């Protein structure tokens, strides 16, 4: 396991143990709904299903096609806020 992987695992473990991971997920859900991201993704999914046809569109097709677009559509302000919260948590709980 690389040094980066170990650090990520340690950070993830600390976030999970302290309950911060769930709080961050809830914040992310709320922010993405608030900015219309979820509605944009629903519309993209509907477009893919129309294009492929209901009988031929699979969940895997949707995941493959929508995931990269979904990541790009996350507003920078949401990414910054989440990163800021993670950094603040880590600074507060540094060992």
From Swiss-Prot:
Give the chief site where it resides.
nucleus
Transcription regulation among keywords:
yes
What is any one GO biological process for this UniProt entry? mRNA export from nucleus
Any Pfam family = EnY2
**The entry's keywords:** Activator, Chromatin regulator, mRNA transport, Nucleus, Protein transport, Transcription, Transcription regulation, Translocation, Transport
Indicate what this protein is called per its UniProt record: Transcription and mRNA export factor ENY2-1
Q: Name one GO molecular function term.
A: transcription coactivator activity
Q: What is the lineage of its organism?
A: Eukaryota, Metazoa, Chordata, Craniata, Vertebrata
**Assembly and oligomerization:** Component of the nuclear pore complex (NPC)-associated TREX-2 complex (transcription and export complex 2). Component of the SAGA transcription coactivator-HAT complex. Within the SAGA complex, participates in a subcomplex of SAGA called the DUB module (deubiquitination module).
Chain's role: Involved in mRNA export coupled transcription activation by association with both the TREX-2 and the SAGA complexes. The transcription regulatory histone acetylation (HAT) complex SAGA is a multiprotein complex that activates transcription by remodeling chromatin and mediating histone acetylation and deubiquitination. Within the SAGA complex, participates in a subcomplex that specifically deubiquitinates histones. The SAGA complex is recruited to specific gene promoters by activators, where it is required for transcription.
Q: Which family does it belong to?
A: Belongs to the ENY2 family.
The reply on keyword Nucleotide-binding is: no
Query: By its UniProt entry, which InterPro entries does this protein fall under?
Result: TF_ENY2, TF_EnY2_sf
Q: Which GO terms describe its cellular component?
A: DUBm complex; nuclear pore; nucleoplasm; SAGA complex; transcription export complex 2
Covalent S-S links between cysteines: none
Where located? Nucleus, Nucleoplasm
């Amino acid at each position: 396991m690389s040094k980066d992987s170990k650090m990520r695992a340690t950070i993830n473990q600390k976030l999970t143990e302290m309950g911060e991971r769930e709080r961050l997920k809830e914040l992310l859900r709320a922010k993405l709904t608030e900015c219309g991201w979820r509605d944009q993704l629903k519309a993209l999914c509907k477009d893919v299903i129309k294009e492929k046809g209901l009988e031929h569109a699979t969940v895997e097709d949707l995941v493959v096609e929508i995931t990269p677009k979904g990541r790009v559509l996350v507003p920078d302000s949401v990414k910054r806020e989440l990163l800021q919260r993670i950094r603040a948590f880590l600074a507060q709980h540094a060992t």
